[in-house]
Amino acid sequence: MLRQPRLWLGTGLIAAVVSMLFALLYVGGNVNPKGNLRDLPVALVNADSGADAGGRHVNMGEQIVAGIQKTAKGDKSIDWQIVTREEADKLLGRGKVFGALVIPRDFSATVTALGSPQPAPQGKAARPTLTVLTNQSAGSIGSSMSSQAAQKAAHAASAQIGQELLKQAAAQKTPLPAAAQLGLADPVNVTVADGHPVGSRSALGLSAFYYALVLVVCGMLGANLVNSQVDTALGYLHTDYGPVRKREPVRHTSRVRTLAIGMALMLGISLVMGTLVEVATVTILDMDASHLGLLWLYSVATIAVVGIGSLALFAAFGTPGMLLATIVFVAMAVPSSGATVPLQALPGFFRALAGFEPLRQITEGMRAILYYGAQADAGLSRAWASMGIALVAALVFGFAVTRLYDRRGLHRIPRPAAGSEARAETPEAPEAPGTTGAEASATA
């Protein structure tokens, strides 16, 4: 057996393609996020009301915004969205931005107080503050990238303001102590806070992705189980129980009917699997979750749609359909889901995949349920719509292909001809005593 070249070539070719494909997809999508970063959405809030200094009204917040916009023209990695604080909170609460830089209302007043000819006593002067907000619910890596960009912009603004304050101090008659000059060189205090906190048992904002991945895997495994069980019941496959092999009598049936049976069975086990996934994660593991009824419905629907889609691929392509389902639902889906590395930090190929790959839509809907109060515009409505489209596409594709196979007589197990069935069913007449076979044939 091992001396047959076909065995080695066939197995080796499939293994080579699968290993190469998984390596290119998994590593290729995540190997250089900073180099691929483009248009990462970050909110920029200027709540500064300005202050009077030297006989004129100044607004340091507007100067910071102008400086950030000027820098952004040559650097397309960050998409700064200028909004109000209320709008920023809404965007953070829907996962539309990965973070924010907030300029407070009294920013100009505290800056001008530092440059006053009669500054407050040392240690009593309030330092101007810029606040960087993170958003782990939108993705920990994306939130980290947003925080780094916002802090970089805040420290650059602090250095620019410090230069102006030092110039003002140098123009005064009384020189400032060295410690005071050092404080003026970097006057702004940059603080980091959580813009949309998630629970302590939310895997740092990754629980939605892991939950969605479990649902997809359950759908695929369920489809494989259903496919093998239906084929076993029809007598197409045997079942091994240790050394014992069992095989049912062959039941000839159409491909369309076989697919319909499998899909109906998949719907039934989706109820069980979806329920047990929620029980395991929420009840046993105490994962942070709300809207438990909606979570259950979403889980069952996801497993059912993924399972039905996999069964359609199995029915259309046979054994290669199992490998194809793995590529569609896992190999291409995980790196393009945007759950770990944000879509804005992926190569263009993976951004295109994210437009239709199921795991991306499933994860967004799961985030909306777990983190964003099940808001429809936080990704939940898109997830339901995508799930409905995928279900219709799977049904149409699966039944169209199997019906075509049936009409062309491409049965999974060739059926015996009608004449041979009749001969098999009609017993032969016994030969008369003393009559040879040749004589019997001649008599007939």
Language-model features: where?
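Alpha-helical membrane-anchoring segments
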Residues: 6, 10, 209-212, 384
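Helix-boundary and loop/linker segments of multi-pass membrane transporters
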Residues: 1, 248-252, 288
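Membrane-spanning alpha-helical segments of multipass transporters and channels
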Residues: 262-268, 276-279, 283-437, 442-443
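Extracytoplasmic/periplasmic domains immediately adjacent to an N-terminal transmembrane anchor
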Residues: 1-201, 205, 408-444
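N-terminal membrane-entry
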Residues: 199-219
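Juxtamembrane interface at the cytosolic side of transmembrane helices
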Residues: 218-271
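Hydrophobic core segments of alpha-helical transmembrane domains
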Residues: 215-223, 394-398
